[in-house]
Amino acid sequence: PTDLITVPTAATLMRGSFSLGMRIQDGGGMILGLRAGITDRFQFGLSYGSPNLIGDDSLRWYPRPEANLKYMLIDESITSPGIAIGLNTQGFGNFNQGDSLNRYDMKAYGFYLSASKNWKTSLGNLALHSGVSYNFTETDDGDEDPNLFFGMDIELNPEFSVLMEYNAALNENNMTTETLAISRGGYLNAALRWTFVE
C-alpha cells in the first residue's frame, strides 16, 4: 500500500493508475483525496474536506486544498528496504485557524522520508515501515520538532490484511525522543483492510 492508515509507506502508484480516497472523521468531518501515478516512481495528489460536513452545524471548509507528493528514491531489494521521499500537507480533525495555532488537531506529516521492507510468510506478505517527517506549515504552536512514525501490515489472505501504525507526534504535546512511549502520547491506529480482487 502507498499508505497504511495515515502513515506513508515507500510504495508509489504505478504510472497511469489512480487512487480515490474518502476519510470520515470524528465530529462529522470528511476528507476526499485523489492521487495519480505520474511515473512508476512519482505520484501526485490533492485532498480537501470539512471538519463538520455531516451534521446540522454551520458548514466549515478547510482553508485550502492540501498536497500529497511522493517519489521513490531506492527500490526495495532482498537485503535493503525501499526508500521514498514525500510531502503530505493534509492534517486531520479541526483546523484551528481563529487562534494562534493555525494547525490541524492532528498535524500533517509535511516533508517525510519513509522506508519499507517486505517478506514472504506462510500467510502472505509481511511488511514493516518506518520514517521521519518534518512539518514546516504548522509551526505557529512553537513545536517544530521532527517526527517519527512506524507501522506494519500482514496479509491474512489475498483479500484481507491487518494494519497497525504509530505516529509518535513528537511535534505535538511537548513530546520528545527521550519521553517517547505509547502510553505518553502519539497516535496508535489499527485496521483491517479488504482489497477487492478479481
Where are these regions (language model features)?
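Glycine- and Gly-Pro-enriched alpha-helical subdomains that act as flexible
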Residues: 143-144
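Transmembrane beta-barrel domains of Gram-negative outer membranes and organellar outer membranes
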Residues: 1-126, 133-137, 155-161, 165-198
